[in-house]
Amino acid sequence: MKFNIVSPVALSCLFFLFLTGTLAQNAGSIVTRELFEQMLSFRNNDACPAKGFYTYDAFIAAANSFPGFGTAGDDTARKKEIAAFFGQTSHETNGGSAGTFTGGYCFVKQIEQSDRYYGRGPIQLTHQSNYERAGQGIGVGQELVNNPDLVATDPIISFKTAIWFWMTEQDNKPSCHNVIIGQWTPSPKDTAANRVPGYGVITNIINGQFECGMGPNTAAESRIGFYRRYCGMLNVPTGENLDCNNQKNFAQG
């Protein structure tokens, strides 16, 4: 019988990767089925239009298409990313009572549907340009432009569009992913606009034109409330700079 001997250097590298979390398998190593159900228990309430749509298996299948999602950095960084992602998307799809932060993932479609490319899915993907870029990003080409309702009828595609948005830089905006794992360095223009690392700038990325630079507001507080709840469930600190109350939105340069 032949034995393969692993060198001390290789063992040291593996140990380092283990300590830093680089070998984390996928988002499922943090978000177990049980935790998913606890975080999003309201989603299958009879009052929710999304009842039965957002499943754990669909989330994991989508997450596994993005190897960096929920796997970058140490244990705290990975958990904070999961808390931040679900904090933002729970607000976007909230159907619960104000101030409870338990009603996430109740909706799939935007209630007020002004055009064909209205908000759908966990991130409430809007605008034809985003449907086109998301389709390219998740490997379905023009399918989302031709049939945008796929984001509201195929749960894996729905989650994929949300994670694609989360992982992707757009225009002058960093990716939400890079912000939450501490890999974003503000430019001089960002600094002048009070855009600083933290959960608040993620709100700015997603909906800054309507929620940032105008002082405290209900929507921004909802996003923070969900994030705090999930950080508590994952036993990680929220970090600083949770709001974007004094930040210029990215559209202002």
Swiss-Prot record:
It is an enzyme of class 3 (hydrolase). One of its GO terms (biological process) is defense response to fungus. It holds the Pfam family Glyco_hydro_19. It catalyses: Random endo-hydrolysis of N-acetyl-beta-D-glucosaminide (1->4)-beta-linkages in chitin and chitodextrins. The keyword Transcription regulation does not apply. PROSITE patterns: CHITINASE_19_1 (PS00773), CHITINASE_19_2 (PS00774). This is Acidic 26 kDa endochitinase. Its main location: secreted. Induction: By fungal infection. Belongs to the glycosyl hydrolase 19 family. Chitinase class II subfamily. It comes from Solanum lycopersicum (Tomato). GO terms for molecular function: chitinase activity; endochitinase activity. Defense against chitin-containing fungal pathogens.
